[in-house]
Curated annotation (Swiss-Prot):
GO molecular function: mRNA binding; structural constituent of ribosome
Gene responsible for this protein: rpsA
Similarity remark: Belongs to the bacterial ribosomal protein bS1 family.
Name of this chain's protein: Small ribosomal subunit protein bS1
Keywords on record: Repeat, Ribonucleoprotein, Ribosomal protein, RNA-binding
Coiled coil: none
Record PANTHER family: 30S RIBOSOMAL PROTEIN S1, SMALL RIBOSOMAL SUBUNIT PROTEIN BS1C
Gene3D superfamilies (UniProt xref): Nucleic acid-binding proteins
A Pfam family assignment: S1
PROSITE patterns in UniProt: S1
Length: 572
């Protein structure tokens, strides 16, 4: 229990320093208390401490101040009975006498000093002692200021406790006396000192220097390294001689790293850093270790859309392109046939020391099944094979488990109805066919069914030369012309425009099936071996022949008679 101080306190302004006198009663009678007004700071004496701190400033009633106003920060302590303290007068009258404030007294005392410091741009010492929403509280020797989270440091702080309860400088950003708010910055101090250190470091930095730094930020293309007062970029390709898909595979935030300055731009002040440059370059003797044509084994390390990566040795990989995985399935998905960690045999195809690339092949270590097939089934060989697949343009037959041959629709029959015959085949049917071509480079085998029988149109070009007059029978009437059979053995066709030399008679419907006609050979269609005929050319030739033969015998004979006679002779 505390003992209340009985002797009354002689009031005085906070700026005045009087000593107590023995005759306290006499002094009280002569003391002028007119200076004690609301809004002033005066000295008072602590006369009691219980739930509150009781302070006597020399008036009729003593003031009661909450203990919390004496404990604004961890550095502050409660006063003891008898101590003199500065207090702020809020009221001088009331039911409980005057109202005092220790907190306002402290602020009033320090505010002027802080305003002067702020106007000069000087720094003020303080201590971070608490966390609040959006930042921290800072004790500026009794005045509490706000430190926003964005003003704590130049980079995010992982452990805020490391900067708390430490006396350190701050810069005052703003002051509002009416609201009693002060905003400070720790970052501004760091940036200023960092700027000076940055200029000093940039003046000394040289390419080839080896420095230590901290990973400040990680991006898809690399990592930014804090070198103390400046940052440098460690590009993805300069992290390791081995393939790195993302910097986070090797680096982590706040990690300490040793780097080399590989490039410094004097104008932009940009610093490019490298880690791999501190290690042995495996590409220096790569061609000696992995000569082209050498067969080796290695483990599958990673897949890509365009192939698979295989480990050559620690930190070094080679690429097997999708087209080099199998002889039979070009550009196949490597995930369907290989697994991570699988040991595979490969051959070195190419080594590019400039681009740091090694091209490998898995299929080159295996016998090409097309070569094996060609050895046992040369062109002209007749084979039997089951149909594996049917498409719009032909048939694929299975020559082995992983080898197919193709029969194009044009190689199914000598006639021009291969597309129709294609529909009569079904998957699994065994077909007999002949090997037509084997293209090792393109990895293609062409087969044919029609080649099993002689070409019925062989020699047609010799027999039916252009201009030859032939007899034919109409076999079908089409919108675009007539299909005919020439000399009872060869297929022919007469286009609509070749049906007559008269425009109004160029109509297929004017003819009938089985009708016999005479026409001239216009050409041979090589793709179908079909003979293209022309009635128009035949009639024009006959007319010219008649004119030549009968036209000069009698000038009085009319043209109609000449043609009639010529046609009559041609029918004999």
């Amino acid at each position: 229990m505390t003992t209340k101080l009985k002797q009354r306190f002689v009031p005085q302004l906070a700026a005045v320093n009087h000593e107590f006198e023995d005759d306290f009663s006499k002094m009280l009678e002569t003391v002028d208390t007119s200076h004690i007004k609301p809004g002033t700071v005066v000295k008072g004496q602590v006369v009691d401490i219980n739930e509150v701190v009781v302070v006597d400033v020399g008036l009729k009633n003593e003031g009661r101040i909450p203990k919390s106003e004496f404990l604004l920060s961890p550095a502050h302590k409660l006063p003891e009975i008898g101590d003199l303290v500065d207090v702020y007068i809020e009221k001088t009258e009331g039911h409980s006498g005057k109202t005092l404030s220790r907190e306002k007294a402290i602020k009033e005392e320090l505010w002027g000093q802080l305003e002067l410091i702020c106007s000069k741009g000087e720094f003020v010492d303080g201590t971070i002692f608490g966390r609040v929403k959006g930042g921290f509280t800072v004790d500026l020797s009794g005045v509490v200021a706000f430190l926003p989270g964005s003003q704590v440091d130049v980079r995010p702080i992982k452990d805020p406790s490391s900067i708390m309860n430490i006396r350190q400088p701050f810069k005052i950003l703003s002051m509002d006396k009416k609201l009693g708010n002060i905003v400070v910055s720790r970052r501004a101090i760091l940036e200023e000192s960092r700027s000076e250190a940055r200029d000093e470091m940039l003046s000394k930095i040289k390419e080839g220097m080896i420095l230590e730094g901290t990973v400040k930020n990680i991006t898809d293309y690399g990592a930014f390294i804090d070198l103390g007062s400046v940052d440098g970029l460690l590009h993805l390709t300069d992290i390791s001689w081995a393939r790195v898909n993302h910097p986070s595979e090797v680096l982590e935030f706040n990690q300490k790293v040793k780097v080399m300055v590989i490039k410094f731009n004097e104008e932009t002040k940009r610093i490019s850093l490298g880690m791999k440059q501190l290690d042995y370059n495996p590409w220096e003797k790569i061609k000696e270790e992995f000569p082209v044509g050498k067969k080796m084994t290695g483990k599958v390390t990673n897949f890509a859309d365009y192939g698979v990566f295989i480990e050559l040795k620690d930190g070094l990989e080679g690429l097997v392109h999708s087209s080099e995985i199998s002889w039979l399935k070009s550009n196949q998905n490597p995930r369907k046939t290989l697994t991570i960690g699988q040991e595979v045999e490969f051959m070195v195809l190419e080594v590019d020391t400039e681009k740091h690339r090694v091209s490998l092949s898995i299929k080159q270590c295996q016998q090409n099944p097309l070569i094996k097939f060609a050895e046992t089934n040369p062109v002209g060989t007749v084979i039997k094979a089951p149909i594996r697949n049917i498409t719009d343009f032909g048939i694929f037959v299975a020559l082995s488990d992983n080898l197919d041959g193709m029969i194009h629709e044009g190689d199914i029959t000598w006639e021009d109805n291969g597309n129709e015959l294609l529909k009569t085949y079904k998957k699994g049917d065994e077909v007999e066919c002949k090997v037509l071509t084997i293209n090792i480079e393109k990895e293609q085998i062409s087969l044919g069914i029609k080649q099993l029988t002689p070409n019925p149109y062989q020699g047609i070009a010799d027999e039916y030369k252009k201009g030859t007059v032939v007899k034919a029978v109409v076999t079908a009437i089409k919108d675009d012309g007539l299909e005919v059979l020439v000399n009872d053995k060869a297929a022919g066709f007469i286009k609509k425009s070749d049906l007559s030399d008269e425009k109004e008679e160029q109509k297929p419907e004017m003819f009938a099936v089985d009708q016999e006609i005479e026409a001239k050979v216009a050409s041979i269609e090589k793709s179908t071996n079909k003979i293209l005929l022309s009635i128009k050319a035949y009639k024009i030739a006959e007319r010219q022949k008649a004119l030549k033969e009968y036209g000069s015998s009698d000038n009085t004979t009319n043209m109609g008679d000449i043609l009639a006679n010529a046609l009559e002779d041609s029918k004999k």
